[in-house]
């Protein structure tokens, strides 16, 4: 009987797609004739929004990879990709929902975004790039801690 009273929890991927992809090689074709020592930087951003259909959410994970030559600081390439997922999420309270959107959903999207980035770099004529796994739970906990610190500092003023 206790099982019947438990709310149904559902976290399902309904659709995955590349929402945006941009590849820039500003110094082509000369860049392919130079001996370069690339320094790679990775930028990560994500956002989510509730969709019109009940319990459906859209999560966008944006990765920006910039390769600059370590000696000249000139941009070798810049790749931006937005991997998007539509998720159906049922039976979670607000705190659990935020955790699911910011951790679970981004963790699902990241391997797809990573593959899109690596493929785009290879298709642009450069050696493939392996992006390390990311602990989105740790990033989310850092974000919550920063928000708490900001709120605490705002309350002291």
Curated annotation (Swiss-Prot):
It comes from the Bacteria. One of its GO terms (biological process) is protein transport. It holds the Pfam family SecB. The keyword S-adenosyl-L-methionine does not apply. It is found in: Cytoplasm. The keyword Chaperone applies. InterPro entries: SecB (IPR003708), SecB-like_sf (IPR035958). One of its GO terms (molecular function) is unfolded protein binding. Its main location: cytoplasm. Keywords: Chaperone, Cytoplasm, Protein transport, Translocation, Transport. Homotetramer, a dimer of dimers. One homotetramer interacts with 1 SecA dimer. This is Protein-export protein SecB.
